[in-house]
Amino acid sequence: MKIIYAFLLIAVVAFMGSGIMAESLAEAIADKPGQAKKIGIFDRITELVNWLVNH
């Protein structure tokens, strides 16, 4: 049971981290400062995987 909770915790942290990274990326590629482009959930997952591979 503890293992299941550990996996769920890791999944939630990874999902939250991908959201934060995607927002930072959206700000970086925005046309104007403070105007972030919308990024979908699959783009967030892709960015998370790319970030994990690069680090």
Swiss-Prot record:
It comes from the Eukaryota. Expressed by the venom gland. One of its GO terms (molecular function) is toxin activity. Keywords: Neurotoxin, Secreted, Signal, Toxin. Residues 23-29 form a propeptide. GO terms for cellular component: extracellular region. Its main location: secreted. Residues 1-22 form the signal peptide. It is found in: Secreted. Belongs to the formicidae venom clade 4 family. Probable neurotoxin. This is Myrmicitoxin(1)-Pr6b. It comes from Pogonomyrmex rugosus (Desert harvester ant). The lineage of its organism: Eukaryota, Metazoa, Ecdysozoa, Arthropoda, Hexapoda.
